[in-house]
A protein has these predicted regions:
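A structural connector/turn signal
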Residues: 34, 46, 50-52, 70, ...
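Residues on the solvent-exposed faces and adjacent turns
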Residues: 47, 53, 65, 71, ...
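A short mixed-secondary-structure module that forms the rim of ligand-binding clefts
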Residues: 78, 82-84
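Glycine-rich hexapeptide-repeat left-handed beta-helix
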Residues: 25-38, 94-232
Length: 232
């Protein structure tokens, strides 16, 4: 018996298919796009962005100048990737997620090949409403929904950051480190300094509430995209 597609999945598939048709109708992809890509027609991608491999970009997502994305990468809807970010390898990035300038994200290690301790391949998965601040570096890291990495934070191989947790500015994890859900971790190597943080704690630390800001900006990206469509 065939599985029924959810309404959301059906809409995404239809939107991506339409995007492929519109891109083809508009002519060849930019010369710096190499590979097989599925770009939603509402996505806003700067002309200088480099895409290689198989890259999927969802509705109303914005990717700024100088970004390089290579490999098998999926980016959800209403997300924001700022200037000069590098994403390579196999990566999955969720919806309404912000990745700021000069961030480096890589898929991580393959399964054990004699030169690493990885028993299974690392996974690079970033959830919804996540906040990856300027200059962060992440190797095969998993971040659950609403998780955050501060300015110049470093996540070594197979780091796992729980839902709503924060890795503080300038902090670094070691390989296989786990930061629990709603924990605040700081230092090199990072140590949990506070558990069960609240939105008030997040506001005090960041000055804005990441989930609220990513929602606000995502809605703005959609509004601007719709305005561009009306002018065409």
């Amino acid at each position: 018996m065939k599985k029924r597609m959810t309404i959301g999945a059906a809409l995404l598939a239809t939107s991506l298919a339409l995007g492929a048709v519109l891109l083809n109708a508009a002519g060849p992809n930019p010369p710096q796009w190499r590979g097989n890509h599925k770009i939603d027609p509402t996505a806003d991608i700067h002309p200088s962005v480099i895409l290689e491999g198989s890259v999927t970009v969802g509705a109303y997502t914005k990717i700024d100048a100088g970004t390089v994305i290579t490999g098998n990468v999926t980016i959800g809807h209403h997300s924001l990737i700022r200037c000069n970010t590098t994403i390579r390898g196999t990566n999955r990035i969720g919806n309404y997620t912000h990745i700021y300038d000069n961030v480096c994200i890589e898929g991580g290690r393959p399964a054990k090949i004699g030169t690493s301790r990885a028993e299974t391949p690392d996974q690079s998965i970033i959830g919804d409403h996540c906040w990856i601040n300027h200059g962060a570096t992440m190797h095969g890291t998993q971040i659950a929904d609403r998780g955050a990495v501060g300015l110049n934070g470093c996540c070594d191989y197979n780091t796992r950051i729980g839902a709503g947790a924060i890795l503080a500015n300038g902090s670094a994890t070691h390989t296989n480190q786990v930061i629990p859900e709603n924990a605040f971790a700081e230092g090199v190597p990072a140590v949990v300094k506070k558990e069960n943080i609240t939105d008030e704690d997040r506001l005090d630390y960041f000055g804005v509430l990441p989930e609220g800001w990513t929602t606000f900006e995502g809605e703005g990206q959609e509004k601007r995209a719709r305005a561009r469509q009306q002018k065409q």
